[in-house]
Structures are given as C-alpha cells and as structure tokens.
Amino acid sequence: DGLRRQRLDVPYVRENGKLRKASWSEALGTAAAALKGTKVLGLVGDLAPVEAAFSLKRMIESLGGSVECRTDGARLPAGNRSAYVGTAAIADLDTAKRIVLIGTNPRNEAPVLNARIRKAWLNGAAVTVVGPDADLTYDYTSAGADRAALKALVAAAEPVEGTVVIVGQGAITEADGTAVLAHAMALADKMGGKFLVL
C-alpha cells in the first residue's frame, strides 16, 4: 500500500540494475546527470503545495528549461507575483465599499466567495460587473460585457475607499488576457483599491 510496506523513506539510485540506498545529494546528483542535455518539462497540478512548485521551478531553470505559468493559457506573468496572487485577501470583501467583477461569475466559479460578496452587498457595498449578465444573488451595475467597457471603466475611474477588483480566469485565458489583466490592475490602482485573481 506504500504506507506500511515498501514505503520510500530514503532515496535510492540504480547501480548495475539494482537499487541501493543513497544520500540525498548523491541521488539528486544522479538525477541531474541523467537529465543533463535533455529537454525537460515539469508540470505542477493545482493542488500541489507552493514549496513543491517552487522547487520544481528551480530545478527546471537549473537544467536550462523555461517556465510557463499556466497550462490553461491564462496570461499570468510569472515575474509579477501580485498579478497572479493579487493584493487583496478574501477578508477584504467583508469591509469592501465597492466590488468590481471582471469576466467572472463567482456564483459558478467560487460559490463561497460569492457568498462573501453577497454579505458585503447586504452591508452596503456597490457591485459592478464587466461581463455577461448573470444571476449572482445580489444586485449589481453592469458596465458592459466587452473589452471596450473595461477600458471605459478604467478611464472614468476615481478613487473609492474599500474597492476590491476581482478578475476571473475566463477573462485572462483569451488572446488578449494580458491586456485584460493590465486593465484590471490599473483599475484597482486608480481606485486606490486591491486586486484579486480567481
């Protein structure tokens, strides 16, 4: 079963067709030598811990590989952490005065987050949506459903204390996803608010 029998608790290297125990430095050195000069690809799943993802990134870079941030085509810049993590915490929704949703239907994509948005709305927060109309369980103002509407919203934006801008994955997986992300970040900055990527 791997937990009680035959559990790997030390690294092994193959020598003359047989496995023998080795130190971590020897095992990693053997693996690095075997990978040297070959094309290497690493893929991290959505549920992998950040430490494992970071270790894989370092290994791929040390072997001369390049790092792609997403496999779904999302235009998230790997070099700008705030662009893919955001600057807002979920708890910021509890005190938000204005929430702007861009290219997302949180009722489908993140129901618990949608409940937090509803709670903020019940406490007086204004909600604006850039995207198709949907039943989100709270009232909102539609700014339009296209990129021109997003640009117009950014151009007209003024500082509003307690603003949280939320961008959905659907908005940044399209060909102009980088521009959408940049506009969303500019909107948050211009409104003096925080930014969150679903």
What kind of region is each of these model predictions?
Residues 1-156, 169-170:
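N-terminal export/assembly segments and adjacent metallocofactor-ligating motifs
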Residues 160-163:
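Structural alpha/beta core scaffold segments of enzyme domains
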Residues 166-198:
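A glycine-rich, hydrophobic/aromatic-adjacent loop/helix-cap motif
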